[in-house]
């Protein structure tokens, strides 16, 4: 801005001359400003790019550090896993020790064997007792049902007898009353004049209707008695069915008892086989015990040899461990001094880093003034960062190599630990190999710690491994002591087992003798039960055959009686229908005669005709009521034809004769009913005796 006064002229005449110069200067300034602006923007973009690269490099450094930490954590996890595997294998050893037989375990095995042998026998006896109780309950139930049915049958029988007696008394009283009425009517007929016959006939017709109603009521009673008879027959059939069902149930129970007897025989045979197999198993176990005694003796001799060899090897290992310990202490001191130097270098590097940070801040301030210098310095820094990146990559590759070597070392250590657990004889040689491998690995780690930044943790791991090895050495000594104690315990156990085997042999012999005795007793009991069952079966079969024969006889007799009664009832029904037809004809003729006046001569002639008809009718009735007469002579159509010759005159006979005939028919019917009742009672008694 100081150049402007020198440009403008002092005079006023020269105003037009400086304007183009001023414009050219403005244009130049504008061009410079634009150039500076472009440069500033380019420098700004470059500065952003450099900052981004710086952030990326820091992120990569953090990532590398995180990966290193993760690798260290993985190594620690591997160590913990190996320790856990060692603990598990120690537990497995203890479990194997616990699996050795002890006297308590032997007692438990004995108790289990005894329970397994006694449980099925007890279960079988319990089931047999339950079955006996069940059969007993069924027998009591059947007996109770039989008594109940018998009592019901007797009660029904008594009711039938009572009802029949009441009916008899009623019929007898009615018969006596009817006979008295008949005598009175007969006397009245003899005393009455013939002129008053018409009125008397009307009265007799009324009485006849009344008697017909009584006859219908008596027929209804006869039908009721027939229905009662059918009911009694149905009850008898029900009783027969019940008896047949009970017999079938008894046969089923007998079959089930035979099946149970066979199953008991099979079970006895199976128990004998089990006893034989148990004896064979006892012999096998005794032979196995002898073999175990021999193996234990060989193992004791081997253990003694191993003890002697272990003592010699332990002394060698102790000497080598002392030497290795002194060497490790020397190496530890060297590593400690190197670590101190590395820590001092690390502090110097930290201070340089802080100084660089300060310089970076100052350079950021000077970037506005010195863009070109900043650009060059930026390029130099990029080169330095790339070099550092290459160094970091080299370190990462070295760390990966160390990781691979460490993994190999871990795998070898794991294999060595497994070999230690599997074979106690090679434990000392594995320890020597581990010490040599540890020395080599320590040397490799010392060489690698010159290139790494954080090797202090690895040294601590090495210290832990050394302490772990010392612990392993102490554990080996303890395991030797445990082996000595276990060998002594095994010897004691062998002696105890021998004594227990002898005791078990004696107990097994006693148990075998007891089982044989019990089997003999049970066989005797089973034979007695079998004999008793055979006797019961024979008795039941005899009773069943007798009852069956009685039932067959009763059934045949009942069928015959039933057929005879059915035939007789059919005949009686036919005759009753004929008589009803005759009665209807007589009623019609009687009505006709009532309308007409009959002279005395015709009356006498009709009386004679009536006597002839009564005689024929009595003959016909005797044929109907007497069952021994042939059915061919029961009906004479000529008589009916002759009776029908005089339709208007011959039915004017006196009514008292009709009443007498009716009374006779009723008396004959009562007799037949009484005979039927007696036959039914006899049949019921015959059916009741086989049921009892």
From Swiss-Prot:
InterPro entries per record: Centro_Cilium_Assembly
GO cellular component, as recorded: centriole; centrosome; ciliary transition fiber; Golgi apparatus
Sorted UniProt keywords: Cilium biogenesis/degradation, Coiled coil, Cytoplasm, Cytoskeleton, Phosphoprotein
Subcellular location as annotated: Cytoplasm, Cytoskeleton, Microtubule organizing center, Centrosome, Centriole
Domain of life where this protein originates: Eukaryota
BP term (GO), one: protein localization to centrosome
Similarity comment: family membership: Belongs to the CEP83 family.
Function: Component of the distal appendage region of the centriole involved in the initiation of primary cilium assembly. May collaborate with IFT20 in the trafficking of ciliary membrane proteins from the Golgi complex to the cilium during the initiation of primary cilium assembly.
Name under which the protein is recorded: Centrosomal protein of 83 kDa
Source organism per UniProt: Rattus norvegicus
Name of the encoding gene: Cep83
């Amino acid at each position: 801005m100081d150049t402007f006064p020198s440009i403008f002229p002092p005079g006023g005449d020269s105003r037009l001359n400086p304007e183009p110069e001023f414009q050219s200067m403005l244009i130049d300034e504008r061009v410079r400003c634009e150039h500076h602006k472009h440069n500033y923007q380019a420098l700004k973009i470059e500065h952003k790019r450099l900052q981004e690269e710086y952030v990326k490099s820091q992120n990569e450094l953090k990532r590398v550090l995180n990966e290193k930490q993760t690798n260290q954590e993985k190594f620690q996890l591997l160590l913990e896993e190996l320790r856990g595997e060692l603990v598990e294998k120690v537990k497995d050893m203890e479990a194997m020790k616990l699996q050795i037989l002890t006297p308590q375990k032997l007692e438990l095995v004995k108790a289990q064997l005894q329970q397994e042998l006694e449980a099925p026998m007890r279960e079988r006896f319990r089931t047999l007792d339950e079955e006996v109780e069940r059969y007993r309950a069924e027998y009591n139930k059947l007996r109770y049902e039989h008594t109940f049915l018998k009592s019901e049958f007797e009660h029904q029988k008594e009711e039938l007898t009572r009802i029949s007696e009441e009916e008899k008394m009623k019929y007898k009283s009615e018969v006596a009353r009817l006979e008295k009425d008949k005598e009175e009517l007969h006397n009245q007929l003899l005393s009455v004049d013939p002129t008053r016959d018409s009125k008397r006939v009307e009265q007799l017709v009324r009485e006849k209707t009344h008697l017909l109603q009584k006859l219908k009521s008596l027929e209804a009673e006869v039908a009721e008695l027939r229905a009662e008879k059918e009911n009694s027959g149905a009850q008898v059939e029900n009783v027969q069915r019940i008896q047949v069902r009970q017999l079938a149930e008894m046969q089923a129970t007998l079959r089930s008892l035979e099946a149970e007897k066979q199953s008991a025989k099979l079970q006895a045979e199976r128990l004998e086989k089990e006893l034989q197999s148990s004896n064979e198993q006892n012999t096998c176990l005794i032979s196995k015990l002898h073999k175990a005694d021999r193996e234990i003796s060989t193992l004791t001799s081997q253990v003694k040899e191993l003890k002697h060899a272990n003592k010699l090897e332990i002394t060698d290992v102790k000497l080598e461990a002392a030497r290795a310990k002194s060497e490790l202490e020397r190496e530890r001191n060297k590593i400690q001094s190197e670590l101190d130097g590395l820590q001092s270098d690390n502090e110097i590097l930290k201070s340089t880093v802080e100084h660089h940070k300060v310089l970076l801040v100052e350079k950021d301030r000077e970037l506005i003034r010195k863009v070109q210098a900043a650009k060059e310095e930026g390029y130099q820094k990029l080169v330095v960062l790339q070099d550092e990146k290459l160094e970091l990559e080299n370190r990462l590759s070295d760390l990966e190599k160390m990781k691979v070597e460490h993994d190999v070392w871990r795998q070898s250590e794991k294999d060595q630990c497994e070999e230690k657990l599997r074979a106690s004889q090679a434990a000392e040689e594995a320890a020597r190999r581990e010490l040599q491998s540890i020395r080599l690995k320590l040397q490799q780690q010392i060489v690698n710690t010159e290139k790494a930044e954080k090797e202090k943790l690895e040294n601590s791991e090495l210290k832990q491994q050394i302490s772990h090895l010392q612990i392993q050495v102490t554990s080996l000594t303890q395991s030797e002591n445990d082996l000595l104690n276990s060998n002594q315990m095994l010897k004691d156990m062998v002696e105890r087992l021998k004594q227990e085997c002898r005791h078990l042999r004696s107990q097994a012999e006693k148990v075998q003798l007891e089982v044989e005795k019990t089997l003999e007793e049970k066989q005797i009991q089973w034979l007695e039960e079998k004999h008793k069952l055979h006797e019961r079966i024979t008795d039941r079969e005899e009773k069943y055959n007798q009852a069956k024969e009685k039932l067959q006889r009763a059934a045949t007799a009942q069928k015959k009686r039933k057929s005879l009664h059915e035939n007789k009832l059919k005949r009686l029904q036919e005759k009753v229908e004929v008589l009803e037809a005759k009665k209807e004809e007589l009623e019609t003729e009687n009505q006709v005669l009532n309308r007409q006046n009959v002279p005395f001569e015709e009356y006498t002639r009709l009386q004679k005709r009536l006597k002839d008809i009564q005689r024929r009718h009595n003959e016909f009735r005797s044929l109907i009521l007497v069952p021994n007469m042939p059915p061919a002579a029961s009906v004479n159509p000529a008589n009916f034809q002759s009776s029908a010759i005089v339709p208007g005159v011959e039915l004017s006979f006196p009514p008292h004769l009709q009443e007498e005939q009716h009374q006779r028919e009723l008396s004959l019917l009562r007799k037949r009913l009484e005979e039927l009742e007696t036959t039914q009672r006899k049949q019921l008694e015959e059916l009741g005796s086989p049921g009892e």
